[in-house]
From Swiss-Prot:
Active site: D45, E117
Gene from which the chain derives: rnc
NCBIfam families the UniProt entry points to: RNaseIII
Name listed for the protein in its UniProt record: Ribonuclease 3
Pfam families: dsrm, Ribonucleas_3_3
Length: 226
């Protein structure tokens, strides 16, 4: 991989790996090599959840568990991680197999989100929990400063349903229109039909649930509720 690109990525991350092989593995999708990033992703997912939960616990001493859970879900969900990945220009650094390259995997939200989690796992193994915690807090500083308890933190499907129910409109319908990839690495495409919108909105995700949430979020944007 181009060392100039890698060095630029590490500057954007705010961390230089002592063991570059961990960085290479974190950037490697299953389609490219047997030494891929899924174990690092598993580790990073748990670390991210802990760090964000800990930050919210101390920032909001009077907020109940339900609101903290919703805020955490907002901060660690796939599209938030994909936003971070785009801020890092992560797509240009991914190691993908020929099929994923051809289908635009470097832009796919689920792959970008998974790679951010893998990088977190890699940084932890390369350093320690204190270092990776501070790094995550640096990445999330603006988002943590801006987030607040309340209805806005409910997941998109819940907010869309409550909006429609409040206006005595039919509930949205979700239809799976495409499933791509093998069992271990699928991408679902969902059409969401909503009263008040002339055409279905589209959502994609690595599971049906995530795709439905993505579609609901797009519907909320079209209804100008986001």
């Amino acid at each position: 991989m181009n060392p100039i690109v890698i060095n630029r990525l590490q500057r954007k991350l705010g961390y230089t790996f002592n063991h570059q092989e961990l960085l290479q593995q974190a950037l490697t999708h299953r389609s490219a090599s047997s030494k891929h990033n899924e174990r690092l992703e598993f580790l990073g997912d748990s670390i991210l959840s802990f760090v964000i939960a800990n930050a919210l616990y101390h920032r909001f001493p009077r907020v109940d568990e339900g609101d903290m859970s919703r805020m955490r879900a907002t901060l660690v969900r796939g599209n938030t991680l994909a936003e971070l990945a785009r801020e890092f220009d992560l797509g240009e650094c991914l190691r993908l197999g020929p099929g994923e390259l051809k289908s635009g995997g470097f832009r796919r939200e689920s792959i970008l989100a998974d790679t951010v989690e893998a990088l977190i796992g890699g940084v932890f193994l390369d350093s320690n929990i204190q270092t990776v915690e501070q790094l995550i807090l640096n990445w999330y500083k603006t988002r943590l400063d801006e987030i607040s308890p309340g209805d806005k933190q409910k997941d998109p499907k819940t907010r869309l349903q409550e909006y429609l129910q409040g206006r005595h409109l039919p509930l949205p319908s979700y239809l799976v229109v495409q499933v791509r990839g093998e069992a271990h690495d699928q991408e679902f495409t969902i059409h969401c039909q909503v009263s008040g919108l002339s055409e279905p909105v589209v959502g994609t995700g690595s599971s049906r649930r995530k795709a439905e949430q993505a579609a609901a979020e797009q519907a909320l944007k079209k209804l100008e509720l986001e």
